[in-house]
């Protein structure tokens, strides 16, 4: 029998409550939570005749444990030993649920964390320990076991693990439910979803975060009903008949869907230069409908509206630095926490920088660092570069580039920074250079682009490969694109844009698409956007942005609670409460 298999009589048949779509938990090792003994517990230990207790475990195994040790790591024992139960001071307690080896294993988890060691636990062992850890309320071990389980979720085991978690640990069930919502397109493609219970499928279909294409919703319901008996699918049939409606899609086709859904991923546009100065609107691209919409960003953050600035999202922190507001060049840094919705001023850069390019790499410990390369300080173009550690709130100068560059493109490839093109005040560059953060050294690329470019943008599209798009060659705005393969050191042409542009922004989404938006087309700032399908090698026109702007910056957010505020899609409680 599969370790996740449980009898039908044991199943908790309701999907998690609304918190399932709001819960956001980091899947990392849990820190040790220190506890302080209450006066009642201390007094109980002082009055008891024995500081040890004998536990009669599974198969009548008898093991002697220290009361303090058990109380320190288990809420169950802490309450048992400190309460006025008849057997609280008893020297013997029976717990048939757990074996001696498993209890010893659970106790070693927090001890290992105290020594800075990460315990090695397999998925099967974690599932076996879930029930006893939950019963004994061993929070440190339970959190770590939950982390192990969440890291090993696949489309094949996720449904069984969800049902198991509902029995023993609802916090884990919420996390697995959230993962099931994210992975549902894969569950559909592999037909694994057919093993869902009727109420589980209804619960998923009512979730606004469900990752399912609109054209597949009818197929999901029809195939599930065919796979199950009429008695098992009666409620789903009624649910579908009541809630399916026709909603228009961007490609002019129409699909029957249960409800409006929020995309798992989004592109957010900050700042830029519009017709009346710095752009004030913050726009978000709905990647389900491929439409731009103005979002309500009601947070009073000083100097968040900039043009020609740098911006990165690092561990829930939106970091904005440098740039230009039409009057002065910025040296300041602003950090906005996407989880707490709080902002703070960061340390100033070592120099003012507008027309700056930004990138992110990880240090040898895996910690993310933000880099600002080149730009202009109001007097001259810069060849300097510096890195920012937001934890220490410190900018540190690194090795200078070999050439002054403003309005160039910077991209991260294989944890190295590649700076391409740009302008030095006299010449537009055709070459590029690579920065190795380990050696703190820049060295030139092995070949030049096919044309000079400034005001261009670059994205990393796969391992060791980047794409540079658009720009200005000194005579005209460019609609061309090229890719550079670090392994062979050569440039190759790519399909041309539908609109020539410079000083725009681009980003990759879903490993399949490259989105570009805004910029200057040679006559005026533009609101046009388009995307490149990397599979078909074709550019596709998208609906316009709400505001024409250049010098904008775009970032991607994936499966983040902050998307709820940006899109503001109603929960549609009428669908949920009726079922």
Curated annotation (Swiss-Prot):
PANTHER family: KELCH-LIKE PROTEIN 32, LD33804P. Kelch repeats lie at residues 266-316, 317-363, 369-415, 417-463, 465-511, 513-559. This is Kelch repeat and BTB domain-containing protein F47D12.7. The lineage of its organism: Eukaryota, Metazoa, Ecdysozoa, Nematoda, Chromadorea. It holds the Pfam family BTB. GO terms for cellular component: Cul3-RING ubiquitin ligase complex; cytoplasm. Residues 51-119 form the BTB domain. GO terms for molecular function: ubiquitin-like ligase-substrate adaptor activity. Keywords: Kelch repeat, Repeat. One of its GO terms (biological process) is proteasome-mediated ubiquitin-dependent protein catabolic process. PROSITE patterns: BTB (PS50097). It comes from the Eukaryota.
